């Protein structure tokens, strides 16, 4: 999973934004 995130920073950023909205 970490490898694919490194290859796709856009996807990782999208997931981080999703988590951020859930935490808010």
Swiss-Prot record:
GO terms for cellular component: chloroplast; ribonucleoprotein complex; ribosome. Its main location: plastid. The keyword Membrane does not apply. GO terms for molecular function: rRNA binding. Keywords: Chloroplast, Plastid, Ribonucleoprotein, Ribosomal protein, RNA-binding, rRNA-binding. The keyword Chloroplast applies. Belongs to the universal ribosomal protein uS19 family. Protein S19 forms a complex with S13 that binds strongly to the 16S ribosomal RNA. This is Small ribosomal subunit protein uS19c. It comes from Petunia hybrida (Petunia). The lineage of its organism: Eukaryota, Viridiplantae, Streptophyta, Embryophyta, Tracheophyta. The gene is rps19.
